[in-house]
Amino acid sequence: VDRRQRQMCIRDSLFNQLVQTEQWQQASVIGLTMSDGLEWETRPIIEQAWKEGKKVAVPKAIKKGSQMDFRQIDSFDQVEAGFAGISEPDPDQTRSLAPEEIDLLVVPGRVFTPEGYRIGFGGGFYDRYLAKFDNPTISLVWQGQLTDNLPTDQYDLPVQELLISQL
């Protein structure tokens, strides 16, 4: 099995775990990033959310203050190349959602501890957003992304639940 096939199997395993969680099933609005090749492919998750009648919110980076504005997308046509080449919602075609309007946030990361602490992709965008987000958070993790400890500070907030693929 080549690396790409293995990654697709892991992604599919994590995707299936996610859509079976109580948090997913109870959520009306899902927040998650548009994948850019460094994290798990999120388009199938977004498509599944739409298929189930859920709303989807994806972040637009606001460089000043390293903030994120999650905006509802109803189609991939509402997405454009944004900050650092990452796909982001077009603000002219989408509406901003407040953190409390998002029922479940799927948080990306490179490395995780079993307690949910993470190293992201730099910039602290998600750490700042998590500080004002009170609803459930989940990360999709391959066992190779787990480590026993990471340096943390007072700004680091753990993800509430890790879905871990054993593949």
Residues of each region from the PLM?
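Short, amphipathic alpha-helical "lid/cap" segments that border enzyme active or binding sites
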Residues: R11-V19
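Single conserved hydrophobic/aromatic residue that forms the stacking wall/gate
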Residues: V1-I10
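Surface-exposed, charge/polar-rich loops and edge strands
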Residues: R3-R4, E100-L105, T113-Y117, D127-L167
